[in-house]
């Protein structure tokens, strides 16, 4: 908000990237691993090959994971957002107005929307690709339904060509792609919006 109002300069993207890489390294050394681009949790296991943290979901925020996995949730309180199926809504922000609506037996919802299938698919990819679990490559626009994960890397398949390019650019993990999942590399985390657009074929 302060940047939009001109009170602070726009952050330099290269400086932000360098700080993120430093934070990732320091947190890794301290036993934390990323489970979503902006969220880290203490690991309970260490990958012997890399010496880096590996298993950590028991320490991750269940609330955050529900959001990034595109699960349903109910938000309670002034200004809270909710998401159930294709419906999304948000409550009035003013605490007095919120309390008055509840007292009068009225809905606290201020506004909402029903998401179409294209929007739901975009959000599923956009949110899922931000997690260390990544997303399944099968079912992305341009992929063929096959039991052979490696076939997704076939340059003749629309999405496969994009996936191969993302691997070549160091943005998604090649080994994970061979197992049928798009998982961001450290570089990919810095360019997650670009990766999402490429996976969606935009």
What are these regions (language model features)?
Residues 137, 174, 191-192:
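Short active-site-adjacent structural elements
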Residues 186-202:
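Short, amphipathic alpha-helical interaction segments positioned at domain boundaries
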Residues 1-153:
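C-terminal scaffold of the Radical SAM
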Residues 179-185:
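Minor-groove-contacting beta-hairpin "wing" of winged helix-turn-helix DNA-binding domains
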Residues 24, 163-164:
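Short glycine-/small-residue-rich flexible loop motifs, especially phosphate/cofactor-binding loops
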